[in-house]
């Protein structure tokens, strides 16, 4: 009879250690993918901004590199 409470306590302790459900793993993957996409968009915007600045500096120094 003393084993029953110990068994119940062990079950309660072991339940949080159960592996994550598939739904939780999918949600984590989607969040991680969204963050990766956000990083790529920021990087593209950053690179295009650098190219615009470089182009404007080039146009101020030498007009042969300008598209206008």
Swiss-Prot record:
GO terms for molecular function: toxin activity. Pfam families: Chi-conotoxin. The keyword Hydrolase does not apply. The cysteine framework is V (CC-CC). Its main location: secreted. Residues 1-19 form the signal peptide. GO terms for cellular component: extracellular region. Keywords: Disulfide bond, Secreted, Signal, Toxin. This is Conotoxin Lp5.2. It comes from Conus leopardus.
């Amino acid at each position: 009879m003393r084993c029953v409470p110990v068994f119940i306590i062990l079950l309660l302790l072991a339940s949080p250690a159960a592996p994550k459900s598939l739904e939780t793993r999918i949600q984590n993957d989607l969040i991680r993918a969204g963050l990766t996409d956000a990083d790529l968009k920021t990087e593209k915007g950053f690179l295009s901004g650098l190219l615009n600045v470089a182009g404007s500096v080039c146009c101020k120094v030498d007009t042969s590199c300008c598209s206008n």
